[in-house]
Amino acid sequence: METTVSAKNSLENENFLKEKSETVFLDEAAITKPPASKKKRKNRKKKKNNGPSEQFVGNNDLEEQRSGSIDSKDKEKPLDEKVKELENANKTLSDLVRRIQIQRDEAEQKAEIYNRDALNTKQEHLDIKKRLEKSDETVCKLKEENENLQDMLRNVGNELVESRDEIKELIEKQKVQKESVKSHESELSSVMSSEILPKASSDSAGSFEPPVISNISKELINKEYARNVLLQFLENHEHRDKILPILSTALDLEEVHQHLILKNLN
């Protein structure tokens, strides 16, 4: 806006200078014209040269010459003043033209700076727009990743809950199995102490020593113990139902295997 206003002012100043210069040139042309008093003086000189016969007329001419010279002196003064005024006006106009030219150059420089700044601002705007678009894309990706992580966390939480429930069930089953093993061990110890162990010791000529059954576990059972239990199971038909659970523990037998053994022996 500032550059356009300054350019408009410079154009108006140029038009004003043109009009002023035209008026100055017209005034100078008017000054260069010879005044009418000089013509009158020439005519008077001609009349004077005609001779003394016209003395009365000559006297009148002298009076007219005196009055004309006075008038010409009076007129020459304002002409000189006008010349000075015109010279001063020309000087003022030249100074004004120079100032206007300087203002015009400054306005052009400001316009160039303004255009350059406008281009830079436009480029910065485009760069900011691209950055915003990239930021929006990044935000969308982060939202998707966040949703995926939340889904994964929910799935992991559900799996943990299921695993915890399964662990609880396994612990309960293990407790039940331990209790059943303890009950079977106690029954077997009573049977072995009363009937099975004495007979087995007599058959093996006193070489068999009963193991410590109270501390039996699946990991600590050895081959000798498993062999002795198997022999006792085969020899004692009456107590097979009680010996079979301990035998299945020693040999890691499933219920299917237990039923198969009982079926074949019976």
UniProtKB/Swiss-Prot annotation:
Protein's UniProt keywords contain Phosphoprotein: yes
Q: What is its main location?
A: cytoplasm
**Coiled coil residues, start to end:** 73-188
**UniProt domain GRIP: residue ranges:** 216-264
- Please give the biological process terms from Gene Ontology that the record holds: Golgi to plasma membrane protein transport; intracellular protein transport
For region Disordered, the annotated ranges are 1-88
Which residue stretches does the UniProt record annotate as biased composition, category Basic and acidic residues?
A: 63-88
Q: Which Pfam families does this one have?
A: GRIP (PF01465)
Q: Which GO terms describe its cellular component?
A: cytosol; Golgi apparatus
List every position bearing Phosphoserine.
Answer: S10, S202, S204
Query: Where would you find this protein in the cell?
Result: Cytoplasm
- Basic residues compositional bias, start-end: 36-49
Q: Where is the composition biased (Polar residues)?
A: 1-13
Entry keyword set: Coiled coil, Cytoplasm, Phosphoprotein
Q: What is this protein called?
A: GRIP and coiled-coil domain-containing protein C365.11
